[in-house]
UniProtKB/Swiss-Prot annotation:
Enzyme Commission designation: 2.3.2.27
Catalyzed chemical reaction(s): S-ubiquitinyl-[E2 ubiquitin-conjugating enzyme]-L-cysteine + [acceptor protein]-L-lysine = [E2 ubiquitin-conjugating enzyme]-L-cysteine + N(6)-ubiquitinyl-[acceptor protein]-L-lysine
Residue ranges of HEAT repeats: 17-55, 102-140, 144-181, 209-250, 252-289, 354-394, 431-468, 542-580, 596-634, 921-958, 992-1029, 1108-1148, 1150-1188, 1245-1282, 1307-1344, 1371-1405, 1406-1442
Function, in words: E3 ubiquitin-protein ligase component of the ribosome quality control complex (RQC), a ribosome-associated complex that mediates ubiquitination and extraction of incompletely synthesized nascent chains for proteasomal degradation. Within the RQC complex, LTN1 is recruited to stalled 60S ribosomal subunits by NEMF and mediates ubiquitination of stalled nascent chains. Ubiquitination leads to VCP/p97 recruitment for extraction and degradation of the incomplete translation product.
Subunit organization: Component of the ribosome quality control complex (RQC), composed of at least the E3 ubiquitin ligase LTN1 and NEMF associated with the 60S ribosomal subunit. The complex probably also contains TCF25 as well as VCP/p97 and its ubiquitin-binding cofactors.
Compartmental location: Cytoplasm, Cytosol
Pathway involvement of the protein, from the record: Protein modification; protein ubiquitination
Pfam families associated with the record: Ltn1_1st, LTN1_E3_ligase_5th, LTN1_E3_ligase_6th, UBC_like, zf-RING_2
GO CC, alphabetical: cytosol; RQC complex
Keyword match Ion transport: no
Record lineage: Eukaryota, Metazoa, Chordata, Craniata, Vertebrata
Name of the molecule in the record: E3 ubiquitin-protein ligase listerin
InterPro entries in the record: ARM-type_fold (IPR016024), LTN1/Rkr1 (IPR039795), LTN1_E3_ligase_6th (IPR054477), LTN1_HEAT_5th (IPR056241), Ltn1_N (IPR054476), LTN1_UBC (IPR054478), RING-CH-C4HC3_LTN1 (IPR039804), Znf_RING (IPR001841)
Amino acid sequence: MQEFGFMCKEREMETVRGVLPYWPRIYCKISLDLDRRVREATQQAFEQLILKVKKYLAPHLKSLMGFWLIAQCDTYSPAASSARVAFEAAFPAHKQPEALAFCKEEIMNVLLDHLLKETPDTLSDTQAVPIEDRESKYFRVVTCSLLALKRLLCMLPRSENSSLQERLAHLLSQSKFWKYSKHSTSSIRSAFFELMSALCQCSPDVLRAEASRLCPAVLLSIDDSDAVVCPALWEAVLYTITTIEDCWEHVNAQKGVLPKLWSVLREGGRGLATVIFPNLLPFISRVPTNIIKTPTDFYSNFFNSLGQGLSSERAVASPAECSAIISAYMECLRFAMQENAGEEEENKKVQQILISDQLMPLIDSSLKDPKLQNSPLFSQVEETLYSWEKKAESQGLDDKLSRIHATLLREFWENLAHICVSHVDVIEAGEKNLAGVSGLLQVLQNPNCLLKVNKKKKAKIRFKGEGDDESDAVSHVSESQPMSKFIMETCSSSGRDPGIAQLRQERLEDLVCKLAELSMVYISEQRSQQHLMFLAALLSTFPSIRVFQVLLQQSSEEDPKNLNSPDHDVTPRHKNPAVQFLYAKLIFWFNDKSLEESDFLVDILYSVLFCCTDSSERKHLLDDMTKMNFKWSVFLYIIQKACTDPEKYSLASDWLKGEVLGERLICLANDLCTSGLMDKATPSEAYCSKKWALLSLVLSEHVHNEYLIADAYVEKIINKLHSALMKARNLSKAGHLEQSVSFICDVGSNFFSSIKGCLQMPSAEDLLLTIFQLCAQASDTSHMSESLLLKLKNTWLAGLHSLVCQYKNMPQGSNFLKQSAQWVKDQIQTSHLNVKSLQSLICTVDDLYSTILDSSLSGFSLLAEHTASMMPSAETWQKMRHALSSQWLSKPLLEGRLSMNTETSGTDLKSFPKTWLPSHLCTASLLSKMALRLLEKEKSLKEEEIGVKINITVAEMLYSLQWCEELEKPPTLIGECCEMLCSLGVSHEKVMDLSVHLPGLLELLYNRSKEDGSLWSLTANRFIHKRGAGPSELLPLTEDTEKYFPVTLGSLHTIQSLSAFLCPELKEELVIQCTARLMTCSASAVSCTDGGFGYLAIINSCLGSDSDLCQEILPGVLKVMLSWKDDQEDIFLFSSNVQDSSQSLIGLNVEMIRFLSILLKYLASSVSSLVDVDWDFIMCSMLAWLESACESSAAYHIPLVRLFACASCDLATEISHYFESVATSTTMSLPANLMSEWKEFFSEGIYSLMLPMLVRIAEEYKASETSHMSHVLKSLGRTLGYISKEQLLNHKLPAKFVAGQKTNLTDSLQSLLNTLAPLLLYRERSVQITVYHLLDKIMADLPGFDDEDLKSYGDEDEEPALSPPAALMSVLAIQEDLVESILKEIPVGEFAVIEPLKEEFCFVLGYLLTWKLILTFFKAASSQLRALYSQYLRKTKSLNKLLYNLFKLMPHNPVLPGQASDMPSKEPKTFFTEELQLAVKGTATVQQEVPHLACCVYHMTLKDLPAMVRLWWNGCEKRIFNVVDRFTTKYVSSVLSSQEISSVQLSTQVFDGMTVKARSTTREVIATYSVDDICIELIIQLPQNYPLGSITVESGRRVGVAVQQWRNWMLQLNTYLTHQNGSIMEGLALWKNNVDKRFEGVEDCMICFSVIHGSNYSLPKKACRTCKKKFHSECLYKWFTSSNKSTCPLCRETFF
């Protein structure tokens, strides 16, 4: 259908027209389809068809219209809606009736067929559709047909209805039709009743003819409680009793209709009260008198049933249901009263019943039930009462009717008084009951009070004879008639007759006086708080002098002394009874401590004030009360009520502005602040909170933008709060201040947020500054909780927002910015700040800037000035920089980025505080954060001065960050600070983002670098690198090379830092100038900065970054050095203790060594060579410098000595690399004997010095003490990486043996292992990597020493095992414990993050390196040895531990980082596909080193020990089993499979009589074995999860082999491949050997049915003396232990 609709939309009209002849038949069928989605799609497609064919549909309308109308009444709303949309698309609204009239006969035919003829079986295919679906479709079609008939009747023009009379009469005459009223399906019943309502409206005559069927069908269904049916049913009921005049004659009302109605009413409408009960009034209004018979009985039953319905479960639970019942009850009661407003006896009985038995009991019940009190009952009672009052006082009605209603009113008021008194005149009067009484009286007094609560407009019932309230209002009232202001307001707002209101007022006052007097008795005698609250409610509603007189009289009767109390002088102005009552009673109640909450007493107070006519009198009363010692909550309630009610505010406004209240509030503020800060034993929190709430109220509430109290008192209170916060700042512990500070925050926040212009007060600005200061202090400094600091932040931000936004600008006279800037400046420069303190300070100031920039138009200039005022002077910046620790210098010095020839010993010994941050870091980071914030707001800096200051700030920040970065092992404090600053946006990246708007920053950094060098040069280098500045951008600064001479440290460091970014021409010019100056340098200036040292350092720097300059420069410089060797040999530190030399000489020698290293790099990449003299100088100097470095090891704590040692090792490394990489053709151009001299003397000399030096340093220094040795160890390691295996085996290390250590190695080799292996435990990465590379050179040779030992493992050994090198295994045992302690809390399968270069990192790294060596050793062993080694690993369970640990160290996604993401088709590189390069100095990828190494070890383990891994995997628990399988299959199996297949393809191993081929696509290896006439083909299939899964062996071709033998051989190969730790080729070789032995006549072992044992590869040798059969020793051992017998497995005789 959807495709058809789309086709109709897209195709041409002529094409679509072709469908029309077939469409009616298709539509009529599928519009009734079972699937609602099909029906909806059909209507949507029909719409598209209509839009396309338009008028051409007309010929087909009659065949479509019946089903179309049914579709418009579909029970599935989207389908019905789509059908109606299609209908509207076909016909405009005014044409639709005509279209229906045109097709009415056809429509009626379809509808009548569906209603009278069709059945479930005729509508659907009985063979294809289940019975449930058939019935569902039938019920839906009947429902839709009934609704379609209703729609037809309603839409047809009235003139056309007559033409359907006959068809409708026929329908109504059918019994089947009337059965639909009792149908079990609710939708059919609902549709039936809707049709009945439509027939009553459109064709009443037809229905009258069938009244005998209609009336019982409708009226006797009145108790149907189905929610679907009920609305349609009651509509049909009302239409029926209205349309059919004699309807009651066709039903038995007394036995049928009314009992059912009573039942529905008693059950509260059965959950449908909102539907049923609004229909009750029109229903009973149509019940004739002959049905009612006895009105008293009828109305008693009716209202009793309604009353019971109020108690039903649904009515109690649902306010809406309850409201519907109440409304119906009162409407029907008014109707019944109107119908029986006569003086006959029967009428009087009904009136009596309605008043006494119905209305008054209902009111009485409501006073006990809060649900009824919240219902519309009281308002309905009031409306009923008003209608009676109007009739009683109306001049237009006859006297009899007025007299009757007057009697009704009198009876009502008498009964009401009796009910109210019965509820009040009780000792234990219920609080809910009294609230109900007061609520009812309040509604009767002021009907408008409910309108405020419920503003929803409701329809009102107006009975016949009742006029509109507004039209009946009497406009002329006698002026002499006394009338209260309250009555006038009530009448004017409701439009009611004031005369009637006055009459009710009198009756109400009588009742209120009676109840008040009664309450007073209980208050006085019983001290009843409930009665007191009731009295307060009465007086609040009825603030009348008369009521107070009654109360006063009652008080005087009880205790005449109350009126003449000596405490209060009742002067003539207190003749007012209300005032007398205040002093006689109310004051004592306020002082009564048993009355915890006194808010209701405040209502009485306002009633007293209402009765006072003079404002001065009211002020005097309140002032008098203020001087009394009342609870502060009393004044809180007084002011709260004044703020919520304008009338009450007018009564208390003079008092609020007065001095009496103001002074009391100042005293309150002082007491609260003093007690809260000084006394830990503060009053209860609730009591204090009331006091603080009072302060907050008077400071925050305002009327017409004025404070509630006088401005002077507001400022004094703010002063008190400010003083309190200042004290809180100065107290050492603030834990007990939380409550007071929190309250002050609440008060301040309300004050700042609510009053416009509040910060014009100086005290308010001081308060704001103090809160700002508290917020800027970290919680560990201020000792305040995070929640309180958050509240402080919100408070001061509210104040700042008020300061900015309400003025649209910062006020000119504001001191807040100046004071805050000075305070922040003092904090960052003089205070000791930790990370948290600095973060709090930065965040708080940042909040200040953000708020002002977002709110103020001129915020930028204000904050620029603010930032400038916080900036230190140039001298202060200089002092702060000098205060930074010089530890930073060691790292760039040793890495060769800076050169020094002066004292640098302090770089390692000078320490700095570990608990607070340097002031330079704090100042620079805060100021730069603010500067960057300003740049974000306004990119272009119009004022040059602002730009200069921002550049200085950012430059200092970059300097500080560079200092942090250059620290080799910074304290934790510095690392945390850098992370914090990065999270706040104080970083290089942020500066780079905004560097375009800082054009002067590069020049500033360059100038600082040239002036001071050192760290400024590194800062400039980092900035240029991050910014990506090219040579062209630097050219304006660097083009004049003359300004670098004479060379200073500043110019030297600048060149060294910028050399990588300078253009080649500039570097060439610098090198030429320095070379020329070097050649003419005097002897005295050789070691000076502006001499040999400086020139050589510049040359090294430029040549190191540009090799194109080397060819011409290097020979010349080398000649200069040779001349120095001849003329000034003492400047060369050869074979001496460097510690005794000057710093300048050490620096010079370092630069000479670096130059020679550059020379060697150049020689290795070019065809040039040197002459004998040059090589002699280089080689001899290198060895002499190395000897000096070794002799000076005790002075390595001095940076320049350490640098000298590193440079010497690096030179040795470059020489070793050169000779290793020299090509054969190049060797011929080298001087004669140079290579032999290198191999026989120089290289031997290097490593005879280096290897012992490494061991000595490692033994003398613990890892924690070698922080200054790190670079030396790295350089040593790089040098030792070039040692050959022969030189390593011929080492000169002292002998080292371990007692009891079993070994087959030579003494020299064992000593080497015992010396180097423990260094894998060393807590320095470079040592571990160096030792690994050294041991890896010899690992493959070690298994050869165990080959001889194989003979000692005879057949008598039950489970032979052989340990890998004992030195490695002892180290591994220690490492296992260490790693276990690190990883024990991490479950297998979870990735453990190991922090680089920490202690744990070294433990894990050493553990993995040790295993890598063991696996290398294992791979190099023969098959027989591997079996013994694997047996040892199985016994010690070391391999199991390794595998568990690997699955904690390998990442979940081992993808190599840094790959391009724009190549999705290419397989990503992983840690398994890429080799790990373990470089000694490599720190770029150290973050990934442990995960990558773990993956490498796992890869090696799977490759070399597949059987053992498979065994471990099968023994794992289910979760780990799945984790291992999933990970291995996804990342490792494909790599190993391809490697295994490749190894088979590339194998050079040749088998006699067997050929092996491999297929990589199918992961198969095919082996073909041929001997004599026998031909065997075996297909080896690798599993998807290789090597975890079992390798399958399938049979190919076989010729000349018995089936049983064939099966045995396949089983043997499968066993070898599954259980042997080796490759497929090794397994095939073992299998072939086994088959060969079989053909040679060697018998199979009768236990494993194999000639060669699968583990130790032995032949069957143990023979039974009885049956002579031979067995493998290991097989026999397993047989004996598993069977617990010592008999032969075959003959069962005792085995000897």
